[in-house]
Amino acid sequence: MKRIFGPALAILLLFVLPLAAQQTGKLVVKADPGRTGVFVDGKYLGPAANFRVARTYNVAAGDHELKLEEPRYEEVVKKITVTANKKTVVAEKLKALPPPKGPFGRLRTESTDKFAAVYVNNKFYGHTDEFSNSSQGLLLPPGEYEVRIEPTSGSPVTQKVKLEADRTVVVK
């Protein structure tokens, strides 16, 4: 019985594993602006591009809701279909919102995951690499905010901050 079970299991795995691998496709989002956040079925995948090169994400085959979000632009939500073992390319130019008026405080973020999502009061604002050094930062009106940094793997960091005009706060 044991001699039959081992080879039967090996044969089964040879057929099942390739079928499981075929259940994903590739998603490429060519968004303008490239720093636009890509969400599939509510889950943040990362920015649309890195240094103007579109990123590719593995996505389960089937119908999905795609949301493109960038705080200075109108968000785009659309239905997409990802086909197993195929590349789905979506191109979108987001419409700019009117620029906000100051004064502003500056929010900086630090994380070991440069593509960790940054949320302010539960709204997506970008990824940590956009706000991570002394010449970068997210400009927000003075006030109190809840900042959440959500890495692609691992636990999110949530911190309440108070921004003052012309001051910088760093969330790690």
Which ranges hold each PLM region?
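Bacterial N-terminal signal peptides
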Residues: A8-P18
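Bacterial N-terminal signal peptides that target proteins for export
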Residues: M1-L9
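Short loop/turn and low-complexity linker motifs enriched in small/turn-promoting residues
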Residues: A21-K172
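Generic low-polarity alpha-helical segments
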Residues: M1-K2, V16, A20
